[in-house]
Amino acid sequence: MGRDSVVKETTLESFLAEKSVKRGDASWKKTIGLNVHDDINGDGEINALDKKAAGDFDLWHEHAVDGVGHRWGMAIDLTSCIGCSACVTACHIENNVPVVGKDEVRRHRDMHWMRIDRFYASDWDMERGEKEGVGVISTYGKMEEPGANPQTVHMPMMCQHCNHAPCETVCPVAATTHSNEGVNQMTYNRCIGTRYCANNCPFKVRRFNWFHYPGYDKFQNFNPAQDAIQRMVLNPDVVVRSRGVMEKCSLCVQRTQSAKLEAKKAGAPLEDGSAITACAEACPTNAITFGDLNDTSSEVRSTYDNNRTYHALEEVGVQPNVAYLTKVRNTPNS
């Protein structure tokens, strides 16, 4: 598991040359293989050559998700993302995410439902290491060396709303559960703050409330909701979390519920685009697409089925409802 398991990138020349290649066979999006204790290749031996695709493994019993009601999902195009953080700001405003200040960030107590991860391209990769006979460990060391003119990849990262979420299986009080619409949801009144879910999350997107930020004088200089007038900046549709509970991205569940109610009152089916998250609405480059994955005519479904689409840390097998589209450059990654 390395950088390529999280962020994928390629050049325009390479992408066009392999555009029609079956997903998983392209050089820029190889299917991840995991070793198994079985004679997969039929050579009569069990060794390191016996591998299965990460998507063929399943640690949990399957349950129907396709074509059953709504299934909210998101697709993020890394080629379009410019790392402006407009989505992060919109998320803070929409979901009453507190501003904790630089002192708390210094203590690793930052509070964001989504963040922008930044990756720099290297002159080295595993293929170059193999060609030049450099060991794996030495290759990783050389990959840390900055290039003369490194390229950057911006990657929005939030809760991936996994269908097989590892956070749900470790919570001792069932404070984090999975809705029948594919959303990993939090029950704040049930949460006792063990932080087991944060430890078990492979994407590290869960945050803990160390204080009651809207009511603590220490944060009054940068947290506006400290008195009755300033509290009017808060979104009344989203609960203000108390001290000692976990919180994370909810895929703006208040917005999807509102869109469903409006459609029900109108006696019409839910139209594609009527439910949209704050981050997708604020994105100036339309890099974020949100909608119902079970709606075959939806924009998010067509984006999801794009040949560039992949899941971060696919080999973990958590089956996220958030997908990314491979970054395509006009110039080489150097």
Name each region found by the language model.
Residues 1-334:
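Non-ligating segments of multi-cofactor redox enzymes
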